[in-house]
């Protein structure tokens, strides 16, 4: 039997580069929320995959951007902390709009030089551009940094992932596996449940409102028939926000609850009874209390 190998990998990049989609594709299950809106990942999420004798632990970090608010600054600090703590960094770049973000990418790379010398460039969303555009972007990005390796992928369609995983397995050091073989994440059921509901809030509420909302799973109960009872609290900053979350005659919260329940049943592979309660609290002043579930 071959000696076990283990590698810790950070998935970093600008918001909406496809980091969460990549980690979901790698583990083969949706463990990280995905929305069209930027900065939806608030807490680093680990996804675990096995390739031969190698266990690779990916950490999906919050997007790196120019932070202004207390919450935003906390997210960016969290992202850089994850980068420092892992063996190697994958910098994910959305090739479909990289020129618009080139200065932001340069800023990340400049800091990366002082934090983590080993970096792999992963050019994502290749399904959205022509081959000539991809080739030009590949050459341009390669000039910005001395990358260990460059891969082109479509995380959404899983194109190019096998080459990336194979390479990471090759460079992984000999170490015992950190997690059990069947484990695909170290996130708790409570956290994953809250994230699912938070995703549905992002998808159903307009503009900036979802950014001012936190979700906490208060209670999970396993029944004899293997179904789950999940009770969650949605915290809104203001009473006016609470009214919008609830919607006219409770229409919004009902729709959000139905969509979240369907997603939770896919995730946990069982019947789920979901109960949502909306409360008003200025939770942003208590980030330490909420960071695991916000």
Q: What are the residue ranges of the model-derived segments?
A:
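P-loop NTP-binding site
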Residues: 189-294
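Conserved G1/Walker A P-loop phosphate-binding module
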Residues: 1-84, 88, 93, 233-235
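Catalytic P-loop NTPase motifs of RecA-like helicase/translocase cores
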Residues: 41, 64-66, 99, 129-130, ...
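Canonical P-loop GTPase G-domain recognition
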Residues: 117-118, 127-189
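Conserved C-terminal guanine-recognition region of P-loop GTPase G domains, centered on the G4
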Residues: 49-55, 74-150, 221-224
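Active-site phosphate-binding and catalytic loops of NTP-dependent enzymes
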Residues: 32-34, 101, 176-180, 203-214
């Amino acid at each position: 039997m071959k000696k076990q190998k283990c590698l810790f990998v950070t998935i970093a990049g600008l918001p909406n580069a496809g980091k969460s989609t990549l980690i979901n594709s790698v583990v083969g299950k949706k463990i990280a929320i995905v929305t069209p809106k930027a900065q939806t990942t608030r807490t680093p999420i680990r996804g675990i995959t096995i390739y031969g004798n190698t266990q690779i632990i990916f950490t999906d970090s919050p997007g790196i951007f120019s932070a202004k608010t207390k919450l935003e600054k906390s997210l960016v600090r969290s992202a850089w902390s994850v980068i420092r703590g892992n063996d190697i960094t994958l910098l994910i770049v959305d090739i479909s709009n990289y020129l618009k973000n080139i200065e932001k990418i340069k800023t990340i790379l400049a800091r990366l030089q002082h934090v983590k010398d080993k970096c792999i460039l992963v050019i994502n969303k290749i399904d959205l551009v022509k081959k000539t555009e991809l080739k030009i972007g590949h050459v341009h990005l390669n000039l910005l940094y001395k990358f260990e390796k460059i891969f082109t992928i479509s995380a959404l369609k899983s194109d190019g992932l096998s080459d990336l995983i194979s390479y990471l397995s090759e460079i992984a050091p000999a170490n015992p596996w950190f997690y059990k073989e069947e484990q695909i994440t170290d996130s708790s059921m409570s956290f994953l449940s809250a994230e699912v509901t938070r995703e549905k809030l992002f998808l159903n509420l307009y503009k900036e409102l979802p950014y001012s909302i936190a979700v906490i799973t208060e209670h999970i109960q396993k029944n004899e028939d293997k179904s789950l009872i999940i009770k969650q609290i949605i915290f809104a900053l203001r009473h006016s926000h609470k009214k919008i979350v609830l919607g006219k005659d409770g229409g919004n919260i009902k729709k959000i609850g139905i969509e979240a329940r369907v997603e939770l049943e896919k995730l946990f592979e069982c019947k789920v009874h979901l109960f949502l309660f909306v409360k008003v609290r200025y939770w942003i002043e208590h980030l330490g209390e909420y960071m695991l579930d916000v």
